[in-house]
């Protein structure tokens, strides 16, 4: 993996190019980059063909290559099969020619806290908790042969974590990484690139310690950084307070080399993503679009500076009875398959009748909208207009700041009244 910084604007962040040589011949990806979040190696609700033909391929143009975000917590059962697989990991998953990065935890689901023993890191799978030693982790990496993988770390921290818990996360990560750095050189035949984890919660001193440990490694030991330990994944990431998060990230970025890529996985809100890009973070994922879809929300926030219509909410609630007779697209002027072929009333009907097509159409729209958002971000940086985009996304042509946090939708379809509507449950 090679990363080239192409352009840095003082007011707008930076543009870069990520060159992956291991993805079946080599691909180039522009940054700021949006990884495609997967579950079990598949994009949620979408087959590989559906994604390529109706999301990745826009207006009949040649599909732009993507970087698949894979998570060990949803794929650990594949290690034995992949050890015998002769081709690339992306080819095994049905996405030949695409890049991939293997992370530990699923950013779409809340990660349980605890289980952090001295010499193991826990991952929580569908089969329960599995404890990973550094030795076992590197065996899995040798089987998966990902294009990029993150170093083993203890990222079980958030804003409420105690100083003791934060320090333990840093110390444990250093012990894990001492072994990972040593063994990574023996994986060179796989062409896998390593991301050094930077942990330490919201403690500047702990973050600095984590950075120093990574930077004291010999040149070439790793290819970039992954900043973790700010949240416990899932919906919690959508509600993070930028005033507390951004100063810590900015402190970290200033201490890291400019020529190394910086990744922050998690369902960060569009506004937080823009602020992080302004600071210098390069890679994010689509878990926010997924979290919105599974909670019956279509993304409709505005990022087109030509539009002057105020939007007090960034979402359209598909379960809202008010849209059951609205025969208009989910979002005006949207070019996705869902908005071109279907209406709000139809998608509402699909959810009301519990049809599988409902989440498929909603996921297509949300991914299309979020990918278009990143295209606009790159264009804004090139024109040094990112501050204007931040202001637009923040206020949505209104007078006050818009709330982008996603709350769990507790509306369910009663089996007794399927087709008649939704009712509210008290389930947490």
UniProtKB/Swiss-Prot annotation:
Record keywords: Cytoplasm, Metal-binding, tRNA processing, Zinc
Superkingdom, natural source: Eukaryota
Required co-factors: Zn(2+)
Stored InterPro entries: QTRTD1, Queuine_tRNA-ribosyltrfase, TGT-like_sf, tRNA_ribo_trans-like
Residues that bind Zn(2+): 334, 336, 339, 365
Pfam families documented for this protein: TGT
Localization per record: Cytoplasm
GO cellular component, one term: cytoplasm
Cofactor note as given: Binds 1 zinc ion per subunit.
Matching Gene3D superfamilies: Queuine tRNA-ribosyltransferase-like
GO molecular function ontology, one term from the record: metal ion binding
Any one of the GO BP annotations: tRNA-guanine transglycosylation
Subunit and interaction comment: Heterodimer of a catalytic subunit and an accessory subunit.
Function according to Swiss-Prot or TrEMBL: Non-catalytic subunit of the queuine tRNA-ribosyltransferase (TGT) that catalyzes the base-exchange of a guanine (G) residue with queuine (Q) at position 34 (anticodon wobble position) in tRNAs with GU(N) anticodons (tRNA-Asp, -Asn, -His and -Tyr), resulting in the hypermodified nucleoside queuosine (7-(((4,5-cis-dihydroxy-2-cyclopenten-1-yl)amino)methyl)-7-deazaguanosine).
Similarity field: Belongs to the queuine tRNA-ribosyltransferase family. QTRT2 subfamily.
Name of the molecule in the record: Queuine tRNA-ribosyltransferase accessory subunit 2
Organism for this UniProt entry: Drosophila willistoni (Fruit fly)
